[in-house]
From Swiss-Prot:
The modification Phosphoserine is found at S94, S98, S104, S153, S329, S343, S747. The keyword Transcription does not apply. This is Actin filament-associated protein 1-like 1. The gene is AFAP1L1. It comes from Homo sapiens (Human). Residues 587-596, 759-768 have a biased composition (Basic and acidic residues). Residues 82-145, 173-211, 566-604, 705-768 are annotated as: Disordered. Keywords: Cell junction, Cell projection, Coiled coil, Cytoplasm, Cytoskeleton, Phosphoprotein, Repeat. PANTHER family: ACTIN FILAMENT-ASSOCIATED PROTEIN 1 FAMILY MEMBER, ACTIN FILAMENT-ASSOCIATED PROTEIN 1-LIKE 1.
Length: 768
C-alpha cells in the first residue's frame, strides 16, 4: 500500500482519536502525550480538499491563515484574487455551494456532533459553523440556531485543544456555548424559571452535556448541581453539590479533586424552608444536634422536592420493622400554603409554644417557630409600626380571649418565684449564651423567655435517665452540662456558686440519680468555691428529696433521710405520739399555712419529720458520744504520758548501762516509740471525731431552741450519774424561752484551743 495513502487515512483517524480524548478524563502523563501528538499534526501538511467537509474550521481565526484558505481553493481551480472584491453575506449560507457537497453523508454525520468550544465567550444565541467552499465563493460567517457543527478545528494544520470548562448548554431549545461552568451545569440540569405559567408548552428534557457527564466528580452520584451555599457571615457562594452514596459533598470548583465539605446524611436533620416574603430563596438547612452545619439555596420548588426525594432514598434504613420505612435522617417539611396557616389561626389559640422533639434540637424548634409565625399574619399591619415585643404582647392579649381557663394557669408568676425550683440560668444556644427562666416540674426542665410568661416555653427537657456534669472550661466555672447517653443535651450556667449548687442538687433528685453533689467532679474552682457549691447542693438535694411525694396522701412533716442514721432508733415517747396525732388531725383539715418557712439543716434533717423530740434525742445522743470520746481521749493521754515516762527512763539507762545490755535497751525503746506513735495516731482520730460530734451537737442545739427545746449537759455529780441519760422530762418544755436558752452549759461549746487540734485540722484540710 502506498505510503501517501496510509498517511491520508492516518491523519483523519488521529484527528478523530484526539476529538474522542477531549471528552475523557485523562491523567497528566496522557494529556502530555496527547499534546505531543497534536504538535506533530501541526507540522504535517493539510489534508486534500475532499476531506474538508469532515473538518471543523474556526472562521474567527481565518484572517491569520491565508495559506490554508488558498489550499482550500486549489481543488476548485479558482483564483482567490477574483473573489476578494465580492460582497459578504453575514446571515445566509453560500448559494454557490455544490449540491453534492451539501448532501454529502459526512456533513449529515457532522451535524450530530457537539458544538465547538471557543477560547473566548461568543455572542449570545449563535455560534460559528464552517461549510465547504464552492468555486467562486469566499469564506463566510454563518449564524445558525438549529444546527450543530463538528467538534474540532484545524487552522493552518494546527490542532486546537478545546477547553473542557466551557461546556455546551441547551437552554429553552437553543444551543449555545457557555463560558461559566457553574451556570452551564446548573442550567443544564433543570429549568429555574419557576414563575412560568402552567399553560406554556413543556420544555425539552435537559440532559447533562457529554463534557460534564464524564467529569470525575459527578460519576456514580445520585444527584448533583451547582447550588448556592450560605457562608459564615451571610454571603452566598456557588458550589458544586453532589450526593454520592449516603454523603453530601461540596466542591468549590469543578476542577477540585477533594471536596470542601463532606456531610453524612444519616446523622443530619434536614429542614426545608420555602420561598416567601421573609426568605428570598428555597433553602435546605442541615443540622446536627443543635448546630446548623450547612444551608443550601435552590431556585425552584421542584428542585427542592427532587433533592428531598433523593435524601429520603439515601437516608432509608436497610431493613424496616414490619415493612414500615423509617428514615434515619428526619426530614422536617414545612407547611407550604400560607392560606392553610391562616385558616388554622381561627381554630387554634395564638401562642408561641413550639413542639419539642426527642433530640431537643434548639435550632429545629427555632425554625419551626419562625414558620409557625405565619399564623399571626393577620396582625402584620399592626406589627409593622411597632417593635416586635410590643406586637407579641398585643398578640398575647388578643389570645387570652380565645383561651379557656385552666387549673395550671391559676398560679401566678409571683408564687413561682417563691419556689426554689426555678430561676434564671444562661443557656448555650447556637454557640451563644441566652438568659432563660428555668423551671423544674414533673421531672422536666422548662425554659421560658421571661418569668412573667409561664404559659409557653421555649424548650423542655425530660430529665429521667439524664446525668449532670459540672464544668465547661475555665471561663465558665459555674457552668454545668446535662447529658443523655453521654451526649450533651443542654449546657447551663449559674450566676454564682450557691446558685450552681442549688441547681445541681435539684437536678440530681429530678433525674432520679443516686449520686450526691459531693460525689461529682468539679473543675476550674478553688477550695472556697467548691465548699460553697457542695454545701448549697447538699441543702437543695435534701430539700428536693423531702418534697417528693412518696406517700399517697400529703403529710405535714417531711420524709427526709438522715445522712448517717442508725438502724435501731430509740422509742419515741408519749409526747411525740401526741404531737403525731395532732399533726394527723391537722392533715384531715387540709389547712396548711403556705407562708410558714422552715430553714433546713443537712445534719439535723430528721427533726422536721419527728418534731422537737427528734431534735432533743439527737442532741442527747451527740452529748453521750461526745463524753465517751472525751473519756477515751483522756485514757489515751494517760497512756501516752506513761509510755513517754518509761521511754525517758530507758534512755537514761542506755546512757549509764554497759555495752552488754545496750542492744536490749535500744529494742525496748524502739518498741515504746512504736506504741507511742500508734497511740498518737489514735488520739488524732479521736480529736477529729470529737470536733465533728461537737459541730453536729451545735447544729442540733441551734435547731432545738427554734422548736422550743432546752438540753442541759450531763451533771458530773455522783448522785445524778446513775440516772438514765436519755430520759424525757415529764413537764412540758417552754417555747421560745430566753431563760432556758441561757441555761446551756459552756462545756457544750467546742474548744478550739490546743496546737494538736490545730495541726489536725490543717492536715485534714490538706487531705481533702
Amino acid at each position: 500500500m502506498d505510503r501517501g495513502q496510509v498517511l491520508e487515512q492516518l491523519l483523519p483517524e488521529l484527528t478523530g482519536l484526539l476529538s474522542l480524548l477531549d471528552h475523557e478524563y485523562l491523567s497528566d502523563t496522557t494529556l502530555e502525550k496527547k499534546m505531543a501528538v497534536a504538535s506533530i499534526l501541526q507540522s504535517l501538511q493539510p489534508l486534500p480538499a475532499k476531506e474538508v467537509s469532515y473538518l471543523y474550521v474556526n472562521t474567527a481565526d481565518l484572517h491569520s491563515g491565508p495559506s490554508f484558505v488558498e489550499s482550500l481553493f486549489e481543488e476548485f481551480d479558482c483564483d482567490l484574487s477574483d473573489l476578494r472584491d465580492m460582497p459578504e453575506d453575514d446571515g445566509e449560507p453560500s448559494k454557490g455551494a455544490s449540491p453534492e457537497l451539501a448532501k454529502s453523508p459526512r456533513l449529515r454525520n457532522a451535524a450530530d456532533l457537539p458544538p465547538p468550544l471557543p477560547n473566548k465567550p461568543p455572542p449570545e444565541d449563535y455560534y460559528e459553523e464552517a461549510l465547504p467552499l464552492g468555486p467562486g465563493k469566499s469564506p463566510e460567517y454563518i449564524s445558525s440556531h438549529n444546527g450543530c457543527s463538528p467538534s474540532h478545528s484545524i487552522v493552518d494544520g494546527y490542532y486546537e485543544d478545546a477547553d473542557s470548562s466551557y461546556p455546551a448548554t441547551r437552554v429553552n431549545g437553543e444551543l449555545k456555548s457557555s463560558y461559566n461552568d457553574s451556570d452551564a451545569m446548573s442550567s443544564s440540569y433543570e429549568s429555574y424559571d419557576e414563575e412560568e405559567e402552567e399553560g406554556k408548552s413543556p420544555q425539552p428534557r435537559h440532559q447533562w452535556p457529554s463534557e460534564e457527564a464524564s467529569m470525575h466528580l459527578v460519576r456514580e452520584c445520585r444527584i448533583c448541581a451547582f447550588l448556592l451555599r450560605k457562608k459564615r457571615f451571610g454571603q452566598w457562594a456557588k458550589q458544586l453539590t453532589v450526593i454520592r452514596e449516603d454523603q453530601l459533598l461540596c466542591y468549590k470548583s469543578s476542577k477540585d479533586r477533594q471536596p470542601h465539605l463532606r456531610l453524612a446524611l444519616d446523622t443530619c436533620s434536614i429542614i426545608y424552608v420555602p420561598k416567601d416574603s421573609r426568605h428570598k430563596r428555597h433553602e435546605l438547612r442541615f443540622t446536627q444536634g443543635a448546630t446548623e452545619v450547612l444551608v443550601l439555596a435552590l431556585q425552584s420548588r421542584e428542585q427542592a422536592e427532587e433533592w428531598l426525594k433523593v435524601i429520603r432514598e439515601v437516608s432509608k434504613p436497610v431493613g424496616g420493622a414490619e415493612g414500615v420505612e423509617v428514615p434515619r435522617s428526619p426530614v422536617l417539611l414545612c407547611k407550604l400554603d400560607l392560606d392553610k396557616r391562616l385558616s388554622q389561626e381561627k381554630q387554634t389559640s395564638d401562642s408561641d409554644s413550639v413542639g419539642v422533639g426527642d433530640n431537643c434540637s434548639t435550632l429545629g424548634r427555632r425554625e419551626t417557630c419562625d414558620h409557625g409565625k405565619g399564623k399571626k399574619s393577620s396582625l402584620a399591619e399592626l406589627k409593622g409600626s411597632m417593635s416586635r415585643a410590643a406586637g407579641r404582647k398585643i398578640t398575647r392579649i388578643i389570645g387570652f380571649s380565645k383561651k379557656k381557663t385552666l387549673a395550671d394557669d391559676l398560679q401566678t408568676s409571683s408564687t413561682e418565684e417563691e419556689v426554689p425550683c426555678c430561676g434564671y440560668l444562661n443557656v448555650l444556644v447556637n454557640q451563644g449564651w441566652k438568659e432563660r427562666w428555668c423551671r423544674l416540674k414533673c421531672n422536666t426542665l422548662y425554659f421560658h423567655k421571661d418569668h412573667m410568661d409561664l404559659r409557653t416555653h421555649v424548650n423542655a427537657i425530660a430529665l429521667q435517665g439524664c446525668e449532670v456534669a459540672p464544668g465547661f472550661g475555665p471561663r465558665h466555672p459555674f457552668a454545668f452540662r446535662i447529658l443523655r447517653n453521654r451526649q450533651e443535651v443542654a449546657i447551663l450556667e449559674a450566676s454564682c456558686s450557691e446558685d450552681m449548687g442549688r441547681w445541681l442538687g435539684l437536678l440530681l433528685v429530678e433525674m432520679g440519680s443516686r449520686v450526691t453533689p459531693e460525689a461529682l467532679h468539679y473543675d476550674y474552682v478553688d477550695v472556697e468555691t467548691l465548699t460553697s457549691i457542695v454545701s448549697a447542693g447538699r441543702n437543695s438535694f435534701l430539700y428536693a428529696r423531702s418534697c417528693q411525694n412518696q406517700w399517697p396522701e400529703p403529710r405535714v412533716y417531711d420524709d427526709v433521710p438522715y445522712e448517717k442514721m442508725q438502724d435501731e432508733e430509740p422509742e419515741r415517747p408519749t409526747g411525740a405520739q401526741v404531737k403525731r396525732h395532732a399533726s394527723s388531725c391537722s392533715e384531715k383539715s387540709h389547712r396548711v399555712d403556705p407562708q410558714v418557712k422552715v430553714k433546713r439543716h443537712a445534719s439535723s434533717a430528721n427533726q422536721y419529720k419527728y418534731g422537737k423530740n427528734r431534735a432533743e434525742e439527737d442532741a442527747r445522743r451527740y452529748l453521750v458520744e461526745k463524753e465517751k470520746l472525751e473519756k477515751e481521749k483522756e485514757t489515751i493521754r494517760t497512756e501516752l504520758i506513761a509510755l513517754r515516762q518509761e521511754k525517758r527512763e530507758l534512755k537514761e539507762a542506755i546512757r549509764s548501762s554497759p555495752g552488754a545490755k545496750l542492744k536490749a535497751l535500744e529494742e525496748a525503746v524502739a518498741t515504746l516509740e512504736a506504741q507511742c506513735r500508734a497511740k498518737e495516731e489514735r488520739r488524732i482520730d479521736l480529736e477529729l471525731k470529737l470536733v465533728a460530734v461537737k459541730e453536729r451537737l451545735q447544729q442540733s442545739l441551734a435547731g432545738g431552741p427554734a422548736l422550743g427545746l432546752s438540753v442541759s449537759s450531763k451533771p458530773k455529780s455522783g448522785e445524778t450519774a446513775n440516772k438514765p441519760q436519755n430520759s424525757v422530762p415529764e413537764q412540758p418544755l417552754p417555747v421560745n424561752c430566753v431563760s432556758e436558752l441561757r441555761k446551756r452549759s459552756p462545756s457544750i461549746v467546742a474548744s478550739n484551743q490546743g496546737r494538736v487540734l490545730q495541726k489536725a485540722k490543717e492536715w485534714e484540710m490538706k487531705k481533702t
